[in-house]
A protein has these predicted regions:
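Polar/charged alpha-helical tracts
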Residues: 32, 52-61, 113, 117, ...
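Membrane-interface aromatic/basic loop that binds lipid-linked glycans or pyrophosphate carriers
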Residues: 274-352
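Short, solvent-exposed segments of well-ordered alpha helices
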Residues: 225-229, 256, 323-326
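Alpha-helical scaffolds flanking conserved acidic
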Residues: 189, 252-260
Length: 352
């Protein structure tokens, strides 16, 4: 059995795909233990021609990494591409990479070495260099072992993306964790919302293993405006899922995910109104789901989380327009984090 299945969705990335794939075949880890699954989502540029040339050259040099190319008959989106990659994977771990990013040479070796030290860990997360922030993702010098998975949702060890981590494939299969294909916003958030709630142990390593390139990933604001109602409906759909599953393990972490998404939805709503006033959006479903989340916090004896969600309701949401608040949003929300985690521990102890 392969140890790692690398999944690369491909769509119109001819400018970057060579660097991405070359970084995969340049890994110092044993290539015979790696499979690379490339999902061609009906790319319209020369991406697949570039990929074919690189694979043929690699195989002519007797490279031992195996390749599986999946071709879509029509463009279906990144979520379907990733799901097809999961279905095709045979490795012990699954690893996602965006096709305009690249891996550092020791990426898989560093991650798998951490697995050998912590064989019961279901997630092994690498450090990343963010081109946009010109900084590394985690400011750590030693391996961090996380047994309280709340800490992956928020704080200095939070990981919001699906790339740059080894994910136990049997966890995905056992719980049927897949990407939601009928929304075009926050797909990674929703995937991780389910994943983090179902694993027992994660490890974060200090080594930088991944280079993240911005490259206009996801929808641009203009494209969102073109179909604003569907975008807002996507936010509401995911918030409904969050509210329905807001219970049990990782309650605090899941609550922060829900709050962050609610504030993004409100911010989007306000931008549409300011910049495209002719577009009429129905906001009451968004207000309704935020209200349901607040009531759930009250029923579950979570006063700090209730106070936090007030920031996403009228009239308090007006502070989102204040530059100071927007600049220090993460620091301000972290004021609610520690007391919420403390209350969570107390309630868990009482229930036991």
């Amino acid at each position: 059995m392969k140890e790692v299945s690398i999944i690369i969705p491909i769509y119109n990335v001819e400018k970057y795909v060579a660097e991405c794939l070359n970084s995969v075949i340049s890994q110092t880890y044993d290539h015979s233990k790696i499979e690379c699954i490339i999902v061609n989502d009906c790319t319209t540029d020369d991406s697949m021609d570039i990929i074919d040339r690189i694979i043929k050259k690699y195989q002519s040099d007797n490279g031992k990494m195996s390749f599986n190319v999946i071709n879509h008959e029509r463009n279906m989106g990144i979520s379907v591409s990733r799901n097809d990659g999961i279905d095709a994977a045979k490795g012990e771990y699954v690893f996602f990479i965006d096709s305009d990013d690249y891996l550092y040479p020791d990426c898989l070796k560093s991650l798998y070495d951490a697995h050998l030290m912590h064989k019961d860990a279901e997630l092994i997360i690498g450090n990343a260099y963010n081109e946009m922030l010109t900084s590394k993702q985690f400011d750590i010098n030693n391996i961090k072992v996380i047994n309280n998975l709340n800490y992956l949702f928020e704080g200095s060890l939070a990981h919001y993306t699906v790339w740059n981590m080894l994910i136990k494939r049997n966890v995905l299969n056992k719980h049927n964790i897949k990407f939601k294909t009928d929304v075009s916003v926050s797909e990674d958030d929703l995937f991780n919302f389910h994943l983090y709630s179902l694993v027992n142990k994660a490890v974060i390593i200090p080594q930088i293993t991944y280079f993240y390139r911005k490259n206009n990933k996801g929808q641009t604001l203009n494209s969102k405006f073109e179909n604003a109602q569907n975008t807002l409906a996507g936010y509401i759909s995911i918030l409904n899922i969050y509210e329905n599953e807001l219970q049990g393990r990782c309650y605090v972490g899941k609550s922060f995910f829900a709050f962050n998404l609610a504030t993004r939805a409100i911010d989007f709503l306000n931008k549409v109104r300011n910049e495209v006033p002719e577009v009429e959006l129905q906001e009451w479903p968004l207000r309704q789901i935020i209200n349901k989340i607040q009531k759930k916090h009250i029923r579950n004896c979570r006063p700090i989380l209730f106070l936090m969600t007030l920031l996403a309701t009228k009239p308090f949401e007006g502070i989102m327009r204040i530059r100071f608040y927007r600049r220090y949003f993460n620091r301000i929300t972290m004021l609610f984090w520690k007391p919420s985690v403390l209350i969570d521990k107390i309630l868990s102890h009482i229930q036991k």
